[in-house]
Amino acid sequence: MSSEKLRLKVLEVVQETGDAHSIVFEKPSGVSYKPGQFLTLRLPHVDGPVARCYSLSSSPYTDDHLKVTVKRVKDGRGSNWVCDEVLQGHELDVLAPSGTFTPKSLDTDLLLLAGGSGITPVMSIVKSSLAKGTGRMLLVYANRDEQSVIFHQELREMVAEHPYRLVVLHWLETVQGLPSRKPLQEIVRPWAHAEAFICGPAPFMDCAADALKELGVSRDRIHVERFTSLEGDPWTEVEAVAPEPGGKTVDLVVELDGETHELDWPADQKLLDFLLDKGLDAPYSCRQGDCSACACKLLEGEVTMLNNNVLEKEDLAEGWILACQSLPVSDVVKVSYDA
């Protein structure tokens, strides 16, 4: 996990489907990531640079380079530029990998539900589990038609190589109609014990999550990744609000990258700003509450968030908070980026 700003060279551009491209970046030494995480790219635009988060479809266990896969969005300011303009040899500004849409263990059974470009982080998880894990996987992959299926051949080859560990079921709108709750339930019922990961268009994710909840799958085993467009520019220095001299502080314990830090946290300074001021390499991207790059888990105490456009009520119930928007409420707070 890192907020490090990188300048990455494009090694290859692969056209996956008529409206989806993969961008393969050179991977600098020292950069690591987990399956299911994303990169934040800085892209030019007539109205000024825009930042977009694109999931990694590469695996840290099987791929030497970083690869993101981008599908065109109608009138999308970022996706269309990537698909039309990025060429081999270009260099782009990128924030180091981050995100929490990643399995705690690759040895557990996984239920993967993807729609359209939602296959991107799921592909990273599939490849990683097959390479380093022992768990079995069911992937339900929904698309408009067969021509829209990203990674069609690669998925077919992985199933052929690992028939007892990976099952892939395609749901095509032109054949079966839009995914609906009851048919999905019947498909995934035998996998209700597994850790579930859902990514795709909002209606698909809501349908899939509702189907799992009605089957009795506990919320802590349902992981959802929502694609959002960022409004700010993470490369622009944000003027953090300095704490009032002599103001109230609270006892803060932070678990980050395997280390524990005990600090006096000013009550009027946001958690992320404070950690960065202290020289800690806490992850972040938008700094506006619009993405989950800075998410950490509240283990003890209470905070208030000034803005939250990404965490759902179930996430909040589990203790997830956005460090970029959190102020302390209780006198003692403990958070973990490693949970």
Annotate the PLM regions:
Residues 80-244, 248-253, 260:
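FNR/FR-type flavoprotein reductase catalytic core
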Residues 2-91, 108-109, 143-145, 156-159, ...:
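Ferredoxin-reductase
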Residues 44, 97-98, 338:
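Short, surface-exposed secondary-structure boundary micro-motifs
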Residues 247-287:
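C-terminal accessory/binding modules appended to enzymatic or scaffolding proteins
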Residues 274-283, 293-339:
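Iron-sulfur (Fe-S) cluster-binding segments and ferredoxin-like electron-carrier domains
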